[in-house]
Each structure stands twice: as structure tokens, then as C-alpha cells.
């Protein structure tokens, strides 16, 4: 259950409506997901978050699929169910197959396990890793 009302297009402040228009234009779709509809209560936060996301997830050294898979891995680590589903769908839309998803899950699971072991054991960082 949402802790805020998910705003419809008709309920948007003009500043939020402008951000929604940019999301639609950038993504080439009329669909606006619930995350943006929740953030629309604060048009400045909505605009700032969208601007940052466009830069981070835009063209760069990593492929769009890899970026979505990384976003998915972090979403799993943080236990964000909405984000897990959203970024799984986005990664699949950018070419991720079942085998890649399963390999990603194995990596996320292994990293979580060994991270907890290292933290619990207080293993000191090896000097060569500090470069």
C-alpha cells in the first residue's frame, strides 16, 4: 500500500506535468510508473530525481542492459520489491535473458554471503586492495 496518493495526470502541478512530459518523450511512451506518480507530490524532488536518473542511466561506458542489471543487483541488496520488478523488466527489455538473470542472481547471492562473512569475521583489508 502506498504511503502517498499516486497522482493522476489531472492532479499534477504544472512543474510535475513538465517532468512527466520529459519522461514520456525520453522513454518514447505514454506510460508513467508509480514511482514517478508518488514523487510528483514534490515537483522539485521529482525534477531532481529524474534529471539525475537521465544522466546516470543515459549513454556512457556501460551498456543500457548492464546498467539495468546493476540497478537490479542494488535493488535486491536493498530489498526493494518494486525496484526489483521494475529493473528486471527493464533489463529484459534491453536484452537480458534467463541465463543472464540466473547468473546475476548467483553473483548477488554469493556477494551477500561473502560480504556478511567478511563483516562478521572482521577480516582486515589487504594493502594491495587499497590502491
Regions found by a protein language model. Name each.
Residues 1-131:
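Hydrophobic alpha-helical segments
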Amino acid at each position: 500500500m502506498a504511503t502517498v496518493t499516486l497522482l493522476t495526470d489531472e492532479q499534477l502541478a504544472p512543474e510535475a506535468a513538465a517532468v512527466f512530459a520529459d519522461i514520456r518523450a525520453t522513454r518514447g511512451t505514454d506510460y508513467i510508473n508509480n514511482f514517478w506518480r508518488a514523487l510528483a507530490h514534490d515537483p522539485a524532488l521529482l525534477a531532481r530525481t529524474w534529471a539525475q536518473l537521465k544522466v546516470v542511466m543515459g549513454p556512457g561506458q556501460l551498456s543500457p542492459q548492464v546498467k539495468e542489471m546493476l540497478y537490479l543487483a542494488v535493488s535486491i541488496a536493498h530489498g526493494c520489491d518494486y525496484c526489483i520488478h521494475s529493473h528486471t523488466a527493464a533489463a529484459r527489455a534491453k536484452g537480458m535473458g534467463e541465463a543472464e538473470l540466473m547468473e546475476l542472481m548467483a553473483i548477488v547471492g554469493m556477494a551477500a554471503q561473502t560480504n556478511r562473512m567478511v563483516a562478521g569475521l572482521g577480516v582486515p583489508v589487504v594493502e594491495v586492495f587499497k590502491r
